[in-house]
Amino acid sequence: TMAFVRILATLVRDKNIGSRIVPIVPDEARTFGMEGMFRQLGIYSSVGQLYQPEDADALAAYRESKDGQVIEAGINEAGAFAAWMAAGTSYSNHLHTLIPFYIYYSMFGFQRVGDLAWAAGDLQTRGFLLGGTAGRTTLNGEGLQHQDGHSHALAATIPNCISYDPAYGYELAVIIQRGLEHMFVEKEPVYYYITVMNEAYEQPAMPVGAEQGIVKGMYCIQSDEGTTGARIRLLASGTLLREALAAAVILLSLIHISEPTRQLQ
């Protein structure tokens, strides 16, 4: 999630496309670490800010303005998704291309407003959906209603929804770059769904030449080519990649089975 926010912050500062980026969030902006955008970009309000927020003295205060760029919809996933669809179809409805990024708790996307996801496909919406806190590994304190591990099964039923489940920040950067090219340069009528999680773990450098495999959906993270004997392949994505890497150590040290670990997207 942190890697996504950094990528988004870079995109909104780009002189060519920054003004076309539409960050959309229901009520979870602080969970995702997006509160810095409140002051930087402002939250869109047709009437401006008519009150003084409680955090007015804070560095990342809640700031609404008529020219704000962030759409903060509150606890209204259907409304936020509808705003994403409106921005994602502006290229055809208004002949003005916008690039919407809608991030939300991933359990409250396809499972809650799946009909809108289908409608987005029918309308040839272009944009990015980010299922935050995915993987069933964090946010237990807020209950099982946030524990998403199956939204990709639902996303796979929509033909023009391209979904990825990355584990590392460099994968996310490659996927978003490819999505921008796919939708806004090649002008394909698709949208991207990407799950991101909020666990804190080491972010390695990208293996040389991994970009093509990341885009296609699978690439090799590590391989014990020099070993002999029984060999297996471990395939994993998202939050489970680190578990697969840990399993590889156990297999090699205790059972003497070597494996090339492959990262699924």
Where are these regions (language model features)?
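Thiamine diphosphate
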Residues: 1-204, 211-213
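A broad detector of short, well-ordered amphipathic alpha-helices
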Residues: 82, 177, 242-246, 259
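Long hydrophobic segments that form regular secondary structure
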Residues: 213-254
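Glycine-rich nucleotide phosphate-binding loop and flanking beta-alpha elements
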Residues: 30, 241, 264
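Single conserved hydrophobic/aromatic residue that forms the stacking wall/gate
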Residues: 255-265
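Short, well-ordered secondary-structure micro-motifs
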Residues: 204-207, 245
